[in-house]
């Protein structure tokens, strides 16, 4: 069971934070149709309970996959989900963030380190990608030569936005729009 809701609702503050981070990390993998292994769920629970640290969780996941000889395509996807989830969990509980292009590429590198050789690199080629959430249609992505400027523009627009002038619904709407636009500018390779 992947539901960490019990920790989020009833847990001590540290367990709540870790539970929320794991649930978010695993949920982000689900957006791409990826499912974590039962081993990751067990490891996440140990981390939440304080039985192991995030460093130990990361090492356990790494060792788990190093011990596997051959991988089917499904196992490769599970490996991606487990490794990225562990990396995202670590990032979400850190108290730092650089709202810059360098900061975003650093996040990409840290999430996909050990999964993709191009982790943290801005793509230098044009892409199309069939999205299951769009029933197989593709998003129109920004052309590779224009990516850096497009992302820098988006970040600058976001920096200038005054969050104090919108209510909660306006805030959610604004963030959703920013994420949507940023996604269509997708700076980094993902597959």
Which positions does each model-derived feature cover?
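Helix-hairpin-helix/helix-loop-helix acidic hairpins
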Residues: 137-182
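N-terminal structured helix/loop subdomain that forms the ligand-binding/catalytic interface
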Residues: 1-124
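Conserved small/polar residues in nucleotide/adenosyl-binding loops
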Residues: 184-190
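A glycine-rich, hydrophobic loop/mini-helix early in the fold
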Residues: 111-155
């Amino acid at each position: 069971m992947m539901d960490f809701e019990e920790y989020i609702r009833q847990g001590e503050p540290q367990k709540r934070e870790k539970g929320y981070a794991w649930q978010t990390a695993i949920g982000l993998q689900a957006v791409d149709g990826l499912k974590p292994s039962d081993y990751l769920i067990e490891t996440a629970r140990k981390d939440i309970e304080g039985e192991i640290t995030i460093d130990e969780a990361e090492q356990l996941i790494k060792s788990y996959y190093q011990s596997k000889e051959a991988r089917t395509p499904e196992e490769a996807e599970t490996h991606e989900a487990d490794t990225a989830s562990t990396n995202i969990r670590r990032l979400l509980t850190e108290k730092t963030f650089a709202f810059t292009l360098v900061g975003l590429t650093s996040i990409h590198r840290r999430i996909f380190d050990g999964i993709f050789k191009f982790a943290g690199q801005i793509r230098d080629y044009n892409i199309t990608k069939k999205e299951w959430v769009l029933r197989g249609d593709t998003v129109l992505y920004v052309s590779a030569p224009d990516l850096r400027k497009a992302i820098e523009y988006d970040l600058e627009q976001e920096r200038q936005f005054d969050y104090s002038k919108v209510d909660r619904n306006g805030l959610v709407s604004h963030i959703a729009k920013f994420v949507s636009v940023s996604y269509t500018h997708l700076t980094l390779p993902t597959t």
